[in-house]
Amino acid sequence: MERKDFETWLDNISVTFLSLTDLQKNETLDHLISLSGAVQLRHLSNNLETLLKRDFLKLLPLELSFYLLKWLDPQTLLTCCLVSKQWNKVISACTEVWQTACKSLGWQIDDSVQDALHWKKVYLKAILRMKQLEDHEAFETSSLIGHSARVYALYYKDGLLCTGSDDLSAKLWDVSTGQCVYGIQTHTCAAVKFDEQKLVTGSFDNTVACWEWSSGARTQHFRGHTGAVFSVDYNDELDILVSGSADFTVKVWALSAGTCLNTLTGHTEWVTKVVLQKCKVKSLLHSPGDYILLSADKYEIKIWPIGREINCKCLKTLSVSEDRSICLQPRLHFDGKYIVCSSALGLYQWDFASYDILRVIKTPEIANLALLGFGDIFALLFDNRYLYILDLRTESLISRWPLPEYRKSKRGSSFLAGEASWLNGLDGHNDTGLVFATSMPDHSIHLVLWKEHG
């Protein structure tokens, strides 16, 4: 049949076919199929798949495809990547879905990076790290050996760990190598804090001292407490040192001169923690940039003015029970915006702007967890047997790590958290270095460290 005659015939057949009922159309198709050979059936098979199984992700505009993909959970997205090369190409090009997937795991996101493939790789790395946390495979342990008596004072900063001991020495360790950088003779150490040049120690001999790392010389001696000094903090900009003692007082000292500027009274228990920190919010009593002095005992947290006024009054007292029936666990977190402390009732978070309790986080499956670190996404907690990671968004424990029988100080001075930036969200780079350190009965230091990505 000539092409022109065929086209005329096909037009007539089409008009007739359209006039048939659905049943008649089906019978016509069945008859035509029965008359078809292999070439026609193959052609029919290829075209039917395209007509009946339309690839909407391929046919839709890219903007609409991205919009639909945003409704899928990350695991489904990964499954969809296996459907075809085209699906993998489209899904792997959607920056927003992979950034959202990373955020769902508590990952920090730099929105300025718009490379979708980069974020997909970050997500795959993230789920591997989260799986390691769930399977107790994210950490490894190490020990520091060098002291000959109990170690009751620890302080960590920028990869360096300072340990103060009853053997009348303080040592500075490089955590990454396990090597002792400095070792100097001191008094007994109940609290330590250091920087590149100096070490400040609070002692069971009721004094505070300042030492020079390079020479080991004592450059200042602060006398005035009548009980052991359990906590120290200082600020070079203010030229102020503060100390908390078993004599129930907080003392404010001139760091360079060594003179006592003020004695703050009001505590009725050992003062186990003092903190000097800049305020980051406008509060009822402070403005952003103001320095804040906090002190804590086993029942109360007190907020003080920093000044030289004699007999100055406490600005605010925080507690979890008015009748003192509930004790606060040692360790206090204050980042300028929130105050966080643990108790038998749970983890208490106060808003520093209003001093109101924002929330109480309870872990009913495990009671009496002590606080080590607190961030935007995660909190680090522990008890006598395990180290725990708490997801603050869901208030659920997502990981635990076994601990040996360590020496646990009631004041909280013999254990600490290491690097803290990951508590605000992992980013693929900040899950390195020290996680936790504690002193042991054999006078060594037990370290828990992030394991390198496998």
UniProtKB/Swiss-Prot annotation:
WD repeats: 146-183, 185-221, 224-265, 276-314
F-box domain boundaries: 54-101
Residues modified as N6-acetyllysine: 298
Positions in coiled-coil regions: none
Any matching Pfam family: WD40
Keywords: Acetylation, Repeat, Ubl conjugation pathway, WD repeat
Nucleotide-binding recorded as keyword: no
Reported function: Substrate-recognition component of the SCF (SKP1-CUL1-F-box protein)-type E3 ubiquitin ligase complex.
Quaternary state and interactors: Directly interacts with SKP1 and CUL1.
Name of the protein described by the UniProt record: F-box/WD repeat-containing protein 2
Organism: Bos taurus (Bovine)
